């Protein structure tokens, strides 16, 4: 009987030690995740009244012991985005905090339980919303009203200058902004077709469908007319989305950008942007804003439209793992430092605008 007991004991010891190793590794991984997803700033939920409803926001402030801070107000890009952009903003907020700046963002209407529907908004509606948030922030004793600026990505390019025309801002950070809605839509369409290796025939057919959509928009066609024109195939379009595009498809930032003259502007562009024609964006920004000498342009060759590393974004698995275990590493090399350096630089309180001239698929 004795010799038979030893193998069972050895097997039990192996199982126990295997379990211990698994638990140690799991604990270590959990520790890494918690550490990497902890940020050197304080966060609080805030409520901002605007237009008879409430904006549900997040205010992130530095842990530097100062009583007052400058503020970066966030203007989202396209889509149903919550205040933290599913925590994707937090590494950028941390960079702002290192420069002594707080960050303010809010859930889009209809997102995360917020009242309203973001698809009902025009770019002017979005600008009014941001201006109201700035007014709310200026009334707070912990915010330096002379150091409030804007940060906006993609679709926000049509909103940022409208905000600056409504209320004074000290600076603007524009990330992958477009200039003209229709040009941007056509650029994106062709870029995606090239990326897919589309044939000439497929490309011609896609352009023809896009041209049909443009004609329908120009005629103020209803969603039902759009669906009929496509032979009954909505191709993912919804009535609400069609209404949103109908409100905004004529957007063009060229004239509005004049409101940013004399304001420090950081234009951030990606080398692998298939959503926005960055060459067109840079050309227009330089043409309109170089006169005041306050424009800074930063290029990130390895970045995508979202300023993430292309090598990571092209893989869903890499994106997920990096977001969990090293979220700051998602961004293109130098991007977070570049944001911080801009805020650390000369952003004079006197360089404030206000009162200036005030993915679409088409």
Segments the model singles out, each with a brief description of its role:
Residues 82-92, 108, 279:
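The serine-hydrolase catalytic nucleophile loop
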Residues 93-113:
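Conserved alpha/beta-hydrolase
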Residues 173-259:
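Accessory cap/linker subdomain of secreted extracellular hydrolases
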Residues 276-287:
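Short alpha-helix in the alpha/beta-hydrolase fold that links the catalytic acid
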Residues 32-67:
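N-terminal cap/lid segment of alpha/beta-hydrolase-fold proteins
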Residues 120-141:
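Alpha/beta-hydrolase active-site loop
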Residues 67-77:
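Short beta-strand element of the alpha/beta-hydrolase
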């Amino acid at each position: 009987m004795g010799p038979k007991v030893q193998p069972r004991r050895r097997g039990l010891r192996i199982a126990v030690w295997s379990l211990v190793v698994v638990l140690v590794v799991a604990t270590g991984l959990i520790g890494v995740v918690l550490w990497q997803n902890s940020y050197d700033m304080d966060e609080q939920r805030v409520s901002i009244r605007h237009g008879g409803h409430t904006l549900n926001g997040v205010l992130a402030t530095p842990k530097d012991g100062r009583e007052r801070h400058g503020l970066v107000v966030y203007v989202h890009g396209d889509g149903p985005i919550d205040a933290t952009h599913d925590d994707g903003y937090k590494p950028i907020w941390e960079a702002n905090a290192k420069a002594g700046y707080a960050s303010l963002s809010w859930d889009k209407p209809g997102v995360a339980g917020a009242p309203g529907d973001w698809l009902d908004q025009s770019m002017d509606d979005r600008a009014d919303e941001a201006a109201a948030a700035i007014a709310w922030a200026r009334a707070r004793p912990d915010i330096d009203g002379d150091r409030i600026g804007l940060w906006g990505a993609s679709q926000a390019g049509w909103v940022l200058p409208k905000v600056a025309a409504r209320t004074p801002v000290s600076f603007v950070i524009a990330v992958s902004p477009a200039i003209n809605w229709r040009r941007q839509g056509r650029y994106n369409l062709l870029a995606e077709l090239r990326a897919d290796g589309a044939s000439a025939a497929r490309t011609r057919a896609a352009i023809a469908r896009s041209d049909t959509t443009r004609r329908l928009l120009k005629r103020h066609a209803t969603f039902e007319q759009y669906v009929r024109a496509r032979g009954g195939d909505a191709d993912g379009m919804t009535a609400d989305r069609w209404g949103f595009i109908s409100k905004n498809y004529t957007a063009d930032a060229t004239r509005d950008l004049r409101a940013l003259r004399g304001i420090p502007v950081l234009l951030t562009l990606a080398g692998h942007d298939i959503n926005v024609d960055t060459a067109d964006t840079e050309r227009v920004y330089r043409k309109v804003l170089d006169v005041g000498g306050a424009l800074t342009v930063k290029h990130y060759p390895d970045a995508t439209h979202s300023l993430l590393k292309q090598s990571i974004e092209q893989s869903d698995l890499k994106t997920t793992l990096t977001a969990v275990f090293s979220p700051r590493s998602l961004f293109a090399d130098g991007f977070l430092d570049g944001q911080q350096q801009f805020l650390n630089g000369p952003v004079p309180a006197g360089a404030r605008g206000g009162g200036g001239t005030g993915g679409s698929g088409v």
